[in-house]
């Protein structure tokens, strides 16, 4: 079983790492500071929001779609410019809007991964 780990890519800073050569695998763990809930929930249509949307599409194609399962734990940046208790739902809603529902957020729960 291949489990990959990724953290601190900070998509909210509009700085895109190149994952196009990533081979994928069984499980991807996103270990925090991926993007802010405020940015992903945004309904803005300005240039920054459009660029962030483009990065999320690339994130899906170059990385998320290459894994059978994707789990995420929130870091501190996910909560920036959000109300702490709302962050998880804002991420879930934002991921759904960007066709990223495959990402399962772990928050005070666990998952067993079997080979």
Model region roles, listed by residue range:
Residues 34, 76, 109-111:
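Short, flexible active-site-adjacent loop segments at beta-strand->alpha-helix junctions, enriched
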Residues 71-95:
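Acidic/His-rich segments in extracytoplasmic proteins that coordinate ligands and/or metal ions
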Residues 1-72, 79-81:
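N-terminal active-site segment of His-dependent metallophosphoesterases
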Residues 11, 90-115:
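Conserved catalytic scaffold of divalent metal-dependent phosphoesterases
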Residues 61-65, 79, 89, 93, ...:
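Polar/charged alpha-helical tracts
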